[in-house]
Amino acid sequence: MTKQLLTPTQIGDLPLKNRVILAPMTRTRATPNGTPTELMAEYYGQRATAGLVIAEATGVDSSAISWINMPGIYNNEHVEGWKKTTQAVHQKDGKIFLQLWHPGRATHSLLINGQQPVAPSAIRLENNETHTPDGSK
């Protein structure tokens, strides 16, 4: 099994050096405005020996934030931050995908300046607590 796990494979047109895939995990290491940090570049760069790195859930809009320090990809500052992360992975011959995410009803109004969250239905999320800089609310 280990022997096969470490053999090259391909997903569509994307060749991978092995079959190890790092699943996306919530890291909460972006800046408060969602910009990826040097720590994120280091973290993903350290894991670039996997065949594929799938970076954490990343917000696609400023009105869709469900936890503090959640990374985004909806402005130029975010894009530049992700470029550094991508470069850190590519420098080690790694491949990286970004998990694009809109949390919908899991968005918390405390994290979007009191705005109404945008979701596919008006059904509230039960027990919608969130972590804020001032603790859980």
Regions picked out by a protein language model, each given a short descriptive name:
Residues 1-137:
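Flavin-dependent oxidoreductase catalytic cores
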